[in-house]
Structure formats: structure tokens, C-alpha cells
């Protein structure tokens, strides 16, 4: 634990094309091995494909998709007298966003293993479309998390 208080959060700068912090976070999550220009190409192409189909701006598309993927509740383990309980807690806003983006990207990467091999732009675009329509692996992950929190609601009094 730091002795000098909390470390301040780093300020994230918006991306160059859409001037959006959320798009920049998505680019950083898609990026592998420091290849940011490749990640930017993947994200911009995916967003433009979905935006074209829905006649919306790419940033609106991403915000709609994230709204359906962000979790409100999650469970955290809490040890009480030798037993570990899964205690449901509300997710803070910055963590909601981070988890939503992470689940979108993970679900897009998983698509390759199940449904033939096609490009990451296509997989990300398909996952964003599914998220907007409230289906797909990322939305399922959110629903599973909420179901787990609902099932363990009896341990809510162990909140810390």
C-alpha cells in the first residue's frame, strides 16, 4: 500500500479521427505487441462497417454497443470465517467501461475459433452489431455476470 495516498488516474487522450476517448480505449485494447496503427485500422474499419449498415456515426455505434455490454453488478470474493462468499457489488463507471470494452474485444477474438477464420475487422464489426442487437458473446458474458450476482444476493450484507 502506498504511503503517500492514492495514485491519480492517468488522463486518456481522445483518438485522432473521431476525437473520442472510448474509441481510443478500444484501440488500445485491440492493440497487440505495440502495433497501434494496425489496431487503429482494425477499429476504424469495423466501426465504419457497422455505422454504414445502421446509418449512425461510428462513435454512436460504439456507445450503443457498449451500453448493452457494460455490467452493472459483479461478484467479488469475500472471506468470512473460513468460508469464501461471492458478494455482489455494484461496478464503478470506469470499470464498467473497461470491462465492456474488454469483453467486446475478447468475444471478437473468440469468434475466430468457432466460426471459420476471417479478419479481425469483420469479427469486431460482427460482435459490435450483435451487441447493439443485445445478442452475442459479450452480452452473454454480461448476463452471466448479472445472473451470478443475482444468485448470490443473499450475501449482499457482507459488502465491505
Swiss-Prot record:
GO molecular function, one term: rRNA binding
CDD domains: uS7_Bacteria
Keyword line: Ribonucleoprotein, Ribosomal protein, RNA-binding, rRNA-binding, tRNA-binding
GO cellular component, one term: small ribosomal subunit
SUPFAM superfamilies linked: Ribosomal protein S7 (SSF47973)
Its biological purpose: One of the primary rRNA binding proteins, it binds directly to 16S rRNA where it nucleates assembly of the head domain of the 30S subunit. Is located at the subunit interface close to the decoding center, probably blocks exit of the E-site tRNA.
Family: Belongs to the universal ribosomal protein uS7 family.
Record-given protein name: Small ribosomal subunit protein uS7
Amino acid at each position: 500500500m502506498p504511503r503517500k495516498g492514492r495514485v491519480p488516474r492517468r488522463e486518456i487522450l481522445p483518438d485522432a479521427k473521431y476525437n473520442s476517448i472510448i474509441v481510443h480505449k478500444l484501440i488500445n485494447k485491440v492493440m497487440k505487441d505495440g502495433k497501434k496503427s494496425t489496431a487503429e485500422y482494425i477499429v476504424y474499419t469495423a466501426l465504419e462497417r457497422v455505422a454504414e449498415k445502421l446509418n449512425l456515426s461510428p462513435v454512436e455505434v460504439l456507445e450503443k454497443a457498449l451500453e448493452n455490454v457494460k455490467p452493472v453488478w459483479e461478484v467479488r470474493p469475500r472471506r468470512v470465517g473460513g468460508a469464501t462468499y461471492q458478494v455482489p457489488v455494484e461496478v464503478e463507471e470506469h470499470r464498467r467501461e473497461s470491462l465492456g470494452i474488454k469483453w467486446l474485444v475478447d468475444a471478437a477474438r473468440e469468434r475466430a475459433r468457432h466460426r471459420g477464420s476471417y479478419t479481425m475487422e469483420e469479427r469486431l464489426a460482427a460482435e459490435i452489431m450483435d451487441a447493439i442487437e443485445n445478442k452475442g458473446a459479450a452480452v452473454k458474458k454480461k448476463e452471466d455476470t448479472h445472473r451470478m450476482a443475482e444468485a448470490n444476493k443473499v450475501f449482499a450484507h457482507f459488502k465491505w
